[in-house]
From Swiss-Prot:
GO terms for cellular component: chromatin; nucleus. Pfam families: DEAD_2 (PF06733), Helicase_C_2 (PF13307). InterPro entries: ATP-dep_Helicase_C, DinG/Rad3-like, Helic_SF1/SF2_ATP-bd_DinG/Rad3, Helicase-like_DEXD_c2, P-loop_NTPase, RAD3-like_helicase_DEAD, Rad3/Chl1-like. PROSITE patterns: DEAH_ATP_HELICASE (PS00690), HELICASE_ATP_BIND_2 (PS51193). It catalyses: Couples ATP hydrolysis with the unwinding of duplex DNA at the replication fork by translocating in the 5'-3' direction. This creates two antiparallel DNA single strands (ssDNA). The leading ssDNA polymer is the template for DNA polymerase III holoenzyme which synthesizes a continuous strand; ATP + H2O = ADP + phosphate + H(+). It comes from the Eukaryota. This is ATP-dependent DNA helicase CHL1. Keywords: ATP-binding, Cell cycle, DNA-binding, Helicase, Hydrolase, Iron, Iron-sulfur, Isomerase, Metal-binding, Nucleotide-binding, Nucleus. [4Fe-4S] cluster binds at C260, C278, C288, C330. ATP-dependent DNA helicase important for chromosome transmission and normal cell cycle progression in G(2)/M. May have a role in changing DNA topology to allow the loading of proteins involved in maintaining sister chromatid cohesion in the vicinity of the centromeres. Has a specific role in chromosome segregation during meiosis II.
Amino acid sequence: MDNATKFHHPYSPYDIQLDLMQCVYDTLANPVKKVAIVESPTGTGKTLSLICSTLTWLRDNKADILSSVDTLHSNEDDSHDSEPEWVKDTYKESILKDKLELLDEYEKYLEELHLKENKIIKFGTSIEDKSKVKRRKVTSSSKAKIEVSIEDEDEFVAKPYESDGEETTDLEKKEALSKEVQELLAKFDSSKKNTDNVELGRFASASQNQVRIFFSSRTHSQLNQFAEQLKLTNFPSSFPDKVAHERVKYMPLGSKKQLCINPDVKKWKTLEGINDACSEVRRSKEGCPFYQNTPKWHNSKETNHFRDQVFSDIHDIEDIAKVGESLAVCPYYAARDFIPSSEIVTLPYQYLLSESTRSQLRLDLKGSIVVIDEAHNLVDTINSIHSAEISLSELKQSYNSIILYMKKFKSRLNPGNRVNLLKLSKLITVLINFITTHYKKPGLEVDAFSILESNNTDMLNVHRVLKYIKTSHIAYKLDTYIQKLQEKESPSNQKPSSQPLLYKISKFLECLNNTSSEGSFFFERGPSLRYMLLEPSRIFQDIIDSARCVILAGGTMEPVSQLLQYLVPKLDDSSITKFSCNHVIPDSHLRTYIVNEPQFEFTFEKRNSVNLVQNHLFNFYLELSTTIPKTGGIIGFFPSYKYLDEIIVSWRKAGLFEKLDKERKVFYEMKDGPDPLPDYTSAVANSEGAILFAIVGGKLSEGINFGGNLCRAIVMTGLPYPNVFSGELIISRKHLEEKVLNGGGSKTDANMAAKEFFENICMKAVNQSVGRSIRSINDYSLIYLLDKRYANANIQSKLSQWVRSRIQSVSTVRDVMASSKEFFDQIADT
C-alpha cells in the first residue's frame, strides 16, 4: 500500500502533505510524544492532511482499543478477577463479539437513514410545523412576537430573589449531578420504558468511542470549513471482517446562540443574554418545550433519533440546528449528550481552553487526540479567556443604568433584588473611586486586596454579588432594558453592544474574587483596570495531562520558541515533535527580498525622517508600482495606524500621494474608516493597477487571504514591534524579568529575555502578514522586507521556513527591482 492510499486522502496528495500526515501518524503512534507543532502554509491543504492522518490512526487502532480488557470491563464489577485466564479470554471474546454485532447492526441502520428518500428529518422545516409532536408542545409564550418592545415591561423585571442567593435551585441541583449519577438515574429510568425505547437505546453502547479527536479552531467559519473537508473523505472500517462499512461519527459543538431553537430565548441578541434567558426558561414552571434535564429526556426516542440522524452523514453546525428543529429536540444539549459516541468533535477555543466550560460540557479528553488549528493565536487566546478589563467610563455608565433601573422597577422588585442591586451599585462605586484616586499611568501594578480594603468591602461581598448576578439573570434584564430605552430615544444612531456592560463587570469581579499568583491587576489607558493572566502554561497543562497527544497546527507557527516557552515550559524536548513544511508552489513562484540599504531603518527614532518618508520610502513604492504588472495588486503593510496616517499626511503635503495614485490607484486601511478591500478588489479585477496599504495586526492582516492577482507583491514596511509603553507589555516584561532573576539569571539575562520577547511578538506578526500572499499551487508572488534589520540572522531565523528558504542574494533597490522584473518575465513565459 503506498502512502497516499494508506492515509485515505481523497486526492493525490503533494509530497509535503504526505510528509505532514506521516509525521502526525508517527507522533500519535509514539506514546512518549505529547505535543506536536505542525506548520503548513496557507494553501497547502493542512486541514485535510490533519483529518486524514488523525482519523487513519484512530481507525487503525480502534480494534485494539475496543478489545482492551479495561474497555470491555469498564461497566462490569470485579467478580471475574479471580477467574482463570482462559475464562477471562473467553468472556472477553464473547463481549467483543456482541459489541461488533451491535455495531454492524447500527451501521446498517444509519445507512438506511441516509438512503431513505423521505427522511425523518426534512431540513428547513420550522418548529411551528412540528406541532404534531405531542410530547413537546410549544407554549403560547413561545409563539409571541420575537421583538421585545419597551412596553413589554414584564420581560425586564427580575424574578423574586431570596436571601443572598446561597440557596440552590432545583435546576442547579439537577445540573450539578455528576455524570455517573445521571447515568445511574438513566439506567433506573430505562427499566420503566417500553420495548420501543429500549430498542432505540441499544445503539447507545454500540457507538461509544473510548478515544476521540477534538478539533478546535478560532472561528465558526473555520469549523464549518472543517466539516466541508471531512465530507470529502472515505475511511475503511476499523473492523473490516465484522463491520463492512463504518461511518465517521462527527459531532460539531456550538453555542446556544447558534443552536437554540426556542423562540423565547432566541430573541435575545447577545450570547450572554441567550444563556441567561435559557436558564430562566428552564427554571420556570412551564420549562423549555425542547429540553428537560431528566433521564426520560436524555433517553427518549426523539433524542436518540437526533443522534442517529446527525451520525447518518457529516453535518455542520447549521445542519444540526435544523435536525433539532425537526425533532423538537434541543440540539445544544442533545449534541453534548453524544460526545462519547463521536469519533470527531469540533468545538470553539472557548470550550476547549476554559476548564470550567470543559467541566460544564463534561468534555473528557482522557486518552484522546486534541488538534488546535490557528495555534499561533493560542497564547493570546488563553490569556484573553482568563483576563478581564473594565474602564472608568463603563463603570460610570453601568452605575447610572442600575440607578435608572431601580427607579423604574422599584415597586416591582422584591427586597432580595433591591438589597443586592444596592450592593452591586456600591461595589461599582468602590471601583470608580479606586480608579479615580489611584490611576497615574498605564502599567502600574495593583494589589487585588487594596482595591477593596479601604471601602469596608470584602471578598465575601464580591462572592455574594456574583452569586446574585448569576442566579437572578439581572445582567441581561437590566442591560436589555437600557438598550431598548436608548433605541427608543435615538433609534437611528444606537448600535447594540457586543457585550453588555454588566457581563464585563461580572467577569472582572470573578477575577477579583479568584485572584491568582499567575495573573496581575494593573492600570491601562482610558483609564481602566485590567486583570491579565501571565502564565498560560498552567491552563494548557491540564489539557496535555489528559490528552494522548495535542497537535498545534497553523500556517505560520514561527517563532516556535515563544510557543514552547509559554505553553509547555516544563515538557522535555523528547516529548515534542516539530514539523515545518515547504510550500506547494514551485520555488520559481516566490521570491523573498531583504532591502538592506542603510537608509531603510524604521526605528522609532528614525522612521519619521523627511528624507526617509518623502524620498526613499516614496520612491521605493513608486518604482515598485511601475515594476509589478498592472494586472496584479500590491499590499503594503505598516506597523500601526498612526504611522500610516503620518505617511499619508506627509505625502499629501508634498504632493507625492497624488503622484503615486496616478501611477496606481491607492487604497488604505483606516482605524475607524470603511473597509477598503471591496474597492481594491474591484480595481485589481479591472486591471487598473492598485495598491493597498494595510496595518500589521489590523483588520486585513489576518483571516483574509490575498491570493491570485490581489497580491503579486507584499511589502513589510519596517519591523512591527509592539508598543512597549502599553500597560499589558509593561506588566508582561516585568513578570518575565522577575522570572529570569528568580530562576538565578543575571540582569543581563533578564534584559535579553525581554528583548527576545518583543522580537518574537514582532516576527509572529510579520509571518502572519506575509502568509496571506499565496493561496494555491498555481499562485505566485514577491515578498519585500523593507528594513535593513531583516538582514540580522536572528531575525531571519524567526521567519517561516517557506519564506526564509526563498531569500534572494540581491539587497539594493536597483538590484531588487531588476530581479522582480525578471521574475514576472519568467512567469509570463511559462
